[in-house]
């Protein structure tokens, strides 16, 4: 990040926190989201962590959620994907999964939150089946939320099972106007339950891009 900032002439801000990019989501309008792991990694109380992050990141509200699994990577991008200021895709697992209760509590929390525009979030659920993974993963499931949005395309990791197509359909419904592409891993390292497409990529935003914001059109309004 320092080399990149130097290359394009940006100022460098030294954030006094351990900051894992895969465990932070923002709506772009002052609202942030992470799991409790973000606080734990910094060995701070939640209030201390929130004070620092809000001072440096200009956040109005920072929501901290329970870790989905004590033995997992615990990053929020393996649990959910904000695909717009008012739309989120949240994973769904089988009832016998150790993550089930936490994931459902997470989804219920979003049902109680309002967006930047003062309306409920539009929530889409995406079923993530169990997968065969590496020895280091506990109860792994397909990480369909660990996707990459790149300009007008959405790349969704594929696992070669019957639920791959359903995952693409969820994204198409949640993100009309985007080209949704199933992305098969063609390297020697397969997609894991906690290490997939979003974990292995880094987006670079265009500071000259025009930004237009408006309320999404909802039929019930």
Give the location of each predicted region.
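The feature marks the mature, well-folded catalytic cores of soluble enzymes
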Residues: 1-218
């Amino acid at each position: 990040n320092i080399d990149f900032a130097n290359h394009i002439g940006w100022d460098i801000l030294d954030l006094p926190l351990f900051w894992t990019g895969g465990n932070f989501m923002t709506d772009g309008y002052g609202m942030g989201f992470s799991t409790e792991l973000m606080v734990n990694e910094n060995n701070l109380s939640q209030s201390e962590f929130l004070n620092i992050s809000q001072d440096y990141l200009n956040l109005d509200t920072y929501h901290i959620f329970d870790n989905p699994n004590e033995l997992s990577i615990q990053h929020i991008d393996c649990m959910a994907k904000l695909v717009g200021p008012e739309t989120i895709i949240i994973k769904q697992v089988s009832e016998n999964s150790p993550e089930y209760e936490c994931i459902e509590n997470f989804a219920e929390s979003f049902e109680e939150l309002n967006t930047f525009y003062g309306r409920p979030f539009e929530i889409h659920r995406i079923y993530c089946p169990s997968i065969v993974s590496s020895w280091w993963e506990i109860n792994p499931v397909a990480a369909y939320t660990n996707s990459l949005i790149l300009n007008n395309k959405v790349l969704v990791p594929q696992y070669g099972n019957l639920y791959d197509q359903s995952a693409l359909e969820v994204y198409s419904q949640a993100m009309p106007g985007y080209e949704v592409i199933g992305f098969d891993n063609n390297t020697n390292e397969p997609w894991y339950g906690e290490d997939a497409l979003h974990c292995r990529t880094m987006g670079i935003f265009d500071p000259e891009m025009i930004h237009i914001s408006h309320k999404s059109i909802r039929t019930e309004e």
